[in-house]
């Protein structure tokens, strides 16, 4: 990939606008972007929202196939249904653009994910919970990303201007870091697969909600 980028992806920016950056300058730029509250809070909200998806990917096969006995085809249908949910809510998010602000739609997605995680956590604490309840919890927790993902990205990039590329790189890196964190946390928890997933999801939802609250406070101060 690096070889192809170096030899075949030509720079289109005019020479007079190009920057000669070294590693120290790049790291300083990353730090400056991360310190900017208008970027940091929506970035954290979006990354930990996406981290819920990584929790699901890591645990869903064990829950649905090992615990509930779904075969490979049935699991594929369940997995595809949640992917369809993300697409469906992304479409609804677009249609609500004229009615609700970006921040309001981000909050809608956060509420959906919180509801889904609470359903999963409740199911993990009870015995012999029906499969359809777990599937509903998964659907809400995952499909809510159709709201949180694009709106968190839009809010994070809104004030970046010429730094949009670097800011996007920071956000992308943090999303995968959250995915790595989710995998590590799941490996260290010793309860059932459903309980482990629900607990990590709950932590991630909590950080996401805190970030959205901080962002709302910041927006309120800016309007005053």
What function would you assign to each model-found segment?
Residues 104-151:
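C-terminal transmembrane helical hairpin of 12-TM major facilitator-type secondary transporters
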Residues 72-80, 169:
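Small-residue hotspots at the loop-to-helix junctions and early N-terminal turns
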């Amino acid at each position: 990939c690096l070889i192809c980028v170096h030899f075949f992806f030509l720079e289109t920016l005019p020479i007079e606008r190009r920057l000669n950056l070294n590693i120290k300058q790049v790291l300083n730029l990353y730090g400056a972007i991360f310190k900017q509250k208008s970027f940091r809070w929506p970035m954290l909200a979006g990354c930990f929202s996406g981290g819920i998806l990584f929790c699901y990917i890591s645990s869903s096969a064990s829950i649905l196939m090992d615990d509930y006995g779904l075969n490979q085809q049935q699991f594929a249908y369940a997995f595809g249904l949640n992917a369809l949910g993300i697409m469906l809510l992304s479409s609804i998010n677009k249609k609500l653009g004229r009615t609700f602000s970006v921040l309001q739609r981000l909050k809608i997605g956060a509420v959906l994910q919180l509801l889904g995680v609470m359903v999963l956590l409740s199911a993990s604490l009870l015995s012999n919970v029906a499969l359809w309840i777990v599937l509903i919890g998964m659907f809400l927790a995952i499909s809510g990303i159709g709201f949180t993902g694009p709106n968190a990205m839009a809010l994070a990039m809104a004030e970046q201007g010429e730094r949009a590329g670097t800011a996007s790189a920071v956000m992308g890196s943090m999303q995968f870091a959250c995915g790595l964190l989710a995998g590590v946390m799941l490996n260290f928890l010793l309860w059932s697969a459903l309980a482990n997933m629900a607990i990590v999801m709950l932590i991630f939802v909590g950080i996401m909600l805190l970030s959205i609250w901080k962002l709302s406070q910041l927006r309120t101060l800016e309007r005053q």
